[in-house]
Amino acid sequence: SDDPAFPGALLTPYSLAVLPELDRVVSTNSSMDEVNAFSGVTYQVWQLSTLKLLKTAYLDVDKNLYGHISPEEARVGPDGAVYIQTLGCGIERITDVDRDQPRSKLVYTFPGSFCGVPTIVGHYLVQSVPVMHGLIVLDISNGNKPVEVSRLKLNDGFFSHWTGWDAKTGRLVVTGDHARLYLVKLDQSTGALTMDNAFHDANGKPGFDFANRKWPQGWTGTGQPHGVVFSR
């Protein structure tokens, strides 16, 4: 990821989106190190077949001056553009990656900061937004002008972070800073979110409680779920 044209930039690969039909990969540059957490401001375009670095570019800066900072998760949208979530709670839309000059545009900014892992389902982008303790759904049918269509607060004080989609059940899994995992229903026709209250454990509260459990390896204690994927 080193690029002599960007000697002072943080060029630490964080995530990537693959576009095989264009023979391209788009990667983000951000850091898990707290010291450099808010230093990343670039993305890179690679040739998939050779893994040759084709372009390093700065993300679009909007009037709020922070929505572009720390690009993290990259996702391919229904329009073929790459949507990048930032720690500054922005959504950057990357286009023209098969040309000499790819383009970046900050198309949306969520409230707060430290937004986490997004999920795209059809033409909806689901974003974890810690400051509102839940999720916000954008309709990205018009990628240049996303529109909020729904939001769901999961729990007072819940610092939402990870989202993942299961097409078989039509459910999103959500984790955060609590010892609890939630399942959320997504209406794919409207983008509306609702809690799956049928998914609960012995305490009767929505979600699965990881606190004070006896685990298969013999350890008893509290686990905090983080990254979650569904089996196929």
Predicted regions and their residues:
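Feature marking well-ordered beta-strand scaffolds used for ligand recognition
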Residues: 1-232
